[in-house]
């Protein structure tokens, strides 16, 4: 959530920066609500002052034995008007809050201004795409004989669900374990296991609600307790970041660095017709998430560090990738600055997103009321960052395509072999004659 004081001080400037993000701020509506709020507050202060004066007058009149009924009646009328003003002020504050909850974060000054992904800026590349001396297959054709089962996934749950079997399931698990071990043993994160179901206010905290309700899976408790709607997490960023919700942490506890492996559930409401083949866009997928909660002055150094942590996973796996700075029009709702990592997929002959690392600055913290005690001992909003480290399913896709062999087998990347019982290659099972 944006700081309302910033809008009050520089409404036109904020409107311009929001326009760069593709959001049109209703300046007239905001100004009208603010004018009404100020008028009510001014009138309330006047009424309070008048009531105080009359209260003193009543005391003096009683001391003299004078009749106070007329003055008491006026005080009662003031009280009624103040109650009505308070109710109206609550209504205005709720409408202002609704406006604020729908506004995206402001982009950092270093973010390139642009409309969509075509305006993103490539920062660097790592690795050289492999040159194959045979016709490359995509992950569907490679993986199906090895245990990728799209047919059963669809039978069980519908489109965009996949079942993994045998060595492919083991490779998927190995990737997640490798990522967690790297982040906890080398990058300083604390491993966390989080709930997969959360309450609505948790999603307001990290910015998924109210704007993106259609992208979420809603669930209801059975039995007599089915009055509360809850949600499946679309990323463990949600639960990890909210661990500091409505709390004040000591400065000495920062940075807080958390990682978790979890399934993620997304309805993909706006993705009809996109990536319908294979595992690239699923309703359920696994991800290893990184979250950092830091002091404001450290957040951009933390963002660079987090990008480096995601890069380290790809480098250890030997997967070529590029780092892209997202433009204002392509960033997520809560982000002030985002870098995407895109991995090379030979069958598509292009780079595809595999990680997104963002600094939300105080945007989520303000919604969560997550603070730390600064050097002066005063509570101050923390900055929160999140990043994929990595999307496990898409990493599996990249391994299958980049490590495929002409005979249909897949070489297991060296760093994964300890997690695969020393297995060096995944071969398709022999066909019965």
UniProtKB/Swiss-Prot annotation:
Q: Which domain of life is it from?
A: Bacteria
List positions binding ATP. 266-268, 353-356
Q: Which reaction does it catalyse?
A: tRNA(Ser) + L-serine + ATP = L-seryl-tRNA(Ser) + AMP + diphosphate + H(+); tRNA(Sec) + L-serine + ATP = L-seryl-tRNA(Sec) + AMP + diphosphate + H(+)
Which InterPro entries does this chain map to?
aa-tRNA-synt_IIb, aa-tRNA-synth_II, aa-tRNA-synth_II/BPL/LPL, Ser-tRNA-ligase_type_1, Ser-tRNA-synth_1_N, SerRS_1_N_sf, SerRS_core, tRNA-bd_arm
GO terms classed as biological process: selenocysteine biosynthetic process; seryl-tRNA aminoacylation
Q: To which pathway does this protein belong?
A: Aminoacyl-tRNA biosynthesis; selenocysteinyl-tRNA(Sec) biosynthesis; L-seryl-tRNA(Sec) from L-serine and tRNA(Sec): step 1/1
A single GO molecular function, which one? serine-tRNA ligase activity
Cite a GO CC annotation. Answer: cytoplasm
What Enzyme Commission number(s) apply to this enzyme?
Answer: 6.1.1.11
Q: Which UniProt keywords apply?
A: Aminoacyl-tRNA synthetase, ATP-binding, Cytoplasm, Ligase, Nucleotide-binding, Protein biosynthesis
Positions of L-serine binding: 235-237, 289, 388
Pfam families reported for this sequence: Seryl_tRNA_N, tRNA-synt_2b
What biological function has been recorded for the protein in this entry? Catalyzes the attachment of serine to tRNA(Ser). Is also able to aminoacylate tRNA(Sec) with serine, to form the misacylated tRNA L-seryl-tRNA(Sec), which will be further converted into selenocysteinyl-tRNA(Sec).
Q: What is known of its domains?
A: Consists of two distinct domains, a catalytic core and a N-terminal extension that is involved in tRNA binding.
The family annotation for this protein states: Belongs to the class-II aminoacyl-tRNA synthetase family. Type-1 seryl-tRNA synthetase subfamily.
Subunit description: Homodimer. The tRNA molecule binds across the dimer.
Tell me what this protein is called.
Serine--tRNA ligase
């Amino acid at each position: 959530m944006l700081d309302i004081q910033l809008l009050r001080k520089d409404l036109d400037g904020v409107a311009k920066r929001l326009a760069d993000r593709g959001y049109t701020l209703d300046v007239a509506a905001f100004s009208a609500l603010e004018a009404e709020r100020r008028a009510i507050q001014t009138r309330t202060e006047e009424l309070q002052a008048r009531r105080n004066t009359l209260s003193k007058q009543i005391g003096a009149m009683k001391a003299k034995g004078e009749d106070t009924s007329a003055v008491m009646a006026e005080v009662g009328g003031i009280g009624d008007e103040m109650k009505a003003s308070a109710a109206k002020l609550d209504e205005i504050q709720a409408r202002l809050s609704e406006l604020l909850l729908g506004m995206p974060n402001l982009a950092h000054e270093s973010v390139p201004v642009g409309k969509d992904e075509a305006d993103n800026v490539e920062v660097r590349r790592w690795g050289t795409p492999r040159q194959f001396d045979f016709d490359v297959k995509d992950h569907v054709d490679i993986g199906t004989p090895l245990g990728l089962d799209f047919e059963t996934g669809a039978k069980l749950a519908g489109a965009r669900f996949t079942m993994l079997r045998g060595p492919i399931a083991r490779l998927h698990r190995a990737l997640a374990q490798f990522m967690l071990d790297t982040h906890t043993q080398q990058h300083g994160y604390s491993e966390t296991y989080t709930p997969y179901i959360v309450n609505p206010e948790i999603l307001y905290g990290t910015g998924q609600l109210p704007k993106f309700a259609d992208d979420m899976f809603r669930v209801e408790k059975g039995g007599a307790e089915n009055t509360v709607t809850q949600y499946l997490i679309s990323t463990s960023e949600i639960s990890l970041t909210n661990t500091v919700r409505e709390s004040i942490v000591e400065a000495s506890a920062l940075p807080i660095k958390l990682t978790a492996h979890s399934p993620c559930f997304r309805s993909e409401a706006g993705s009809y017709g996109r990536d319908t083949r294979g595992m690239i866009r699923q309703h359920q997928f696994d991800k290893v998430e990184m979250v950092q909660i830091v002091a404001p002055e450290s957040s951009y150094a933390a963002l660079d560090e987090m990008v480096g942590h995601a890069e380290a996973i790809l480098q250890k796996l030997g997967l070529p990738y590029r780092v892209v700075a997202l433009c204002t029009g392509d960033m997520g709702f809560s982000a002030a600055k985002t870098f995407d990592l895109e991995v090379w997929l030979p069958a598509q002959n292009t780079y595809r997103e595999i990680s997104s690392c963002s600094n939300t600055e105080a945007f989520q913290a303000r919604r969560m009321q997550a603070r730390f005690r600064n050097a002066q001992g005063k509570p101050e909003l923390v900055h929160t960052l999140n990043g994929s480290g990595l999307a496990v399913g898409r990493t599996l896709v990249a391994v299958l395509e980049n490590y495929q062999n002409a005979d249909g087998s897949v070489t297991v990347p060296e760093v994964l072999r300890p997690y695969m019982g020393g297995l060096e290659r995944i071969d398709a099972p022999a066909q019965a004659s």
